[in-house]
UniProtKB/Swiss-Prot annotation:
Residues 28-97 form a propeptide. GO terms for cellular component: extracellular region. Belongs to the guanylin family. GO terms for biological process: adipose tissue development; body fluid secretion; glucose homeostasis; multicellular organism growth; negative regulation of blood pressure; reduction of food intake in response to dietary excess; renal sodium ion absorption; response to glucose. It comes from Sus scrofa. It is found in: Secreted. The keyword Disulfide bond applies. This is Guanylate cyclase activator 2B. InterPro entries: Guanylin (IPR000879), Guanylin_sf (IPR036382). It comes from the Eukaryota.
Length: 113
C-alpha cells in the first residue's frame, strides 16, 4: 500500500515538473504588419529604449529608430529596422504588449471586453 502511494506521489511530481517545463517553453507572439515577434522581445525593446541614449549625431545620420543600432536588440525585432515604418511599428508593438486585452494572456482568453 505504501509503495502505491509513493508511486502516485512520484507520478504527480513528474507531471508537475513536466507542466512547469512545458509552460516555460511556450512563448506568446505578436503578429503585426507581417512581422511576428515574441512578447518578451517587445518588453526588452522598452527596456532598451529606457536605458540607452544614442549620440545626437547617430540620430541625425540614420532614419531608423535609435534602438535599431543597439547591439542587444532581439533578433526577431531586427527585420523591423529595415522597414520605412519601423518607428510606428515599434510604437504599435509597445502599445499591443502593454494592453492585456490585445493579447490572449490567459488560457480561456476571458476577462477583456
Amino acid at each position: 500500500m505504501a509503495s502505491r502511494a509513493a508511486a502516485g506521489l512520484l507520478l504527480c511530481g513528474v507531471a508537475l515538473v513536466f507542466l512547469v517545463l512545458l509552460q516555460g517553453t511556450q512563448s506568446v507572439y505578436i503578429q503585426y504588419q507581417g512581422f511576428r515577434v515574441q512578447l518578451k522581445s517587445v518588453k526588452k525593446l522598452s527596456d532598451l529604449e529606457g536605458q540607452w541614449a544614442p549620440s545626437p549625431r547617430l540620430q541625425a545620420q540614420s532614419p531608423q529608430p535609435s534602438v535599431c543600432h543597439h547591439s542587444a536588440l532581439p533578433p526577431d525585432l531586427q527585420p523591423i529596422c529595415q522597414s520605412e515604418e519601423a518607428a510606428s511599428i515599434f510604437q504599435a508593438l509597445r502599445t499591443i504588449a502593454g494592453d492585456d486585452c490585445e493579447l490572449c494572456v490567459n488560457v480561456a482568453c476571458t476577462g477583456c471586453s
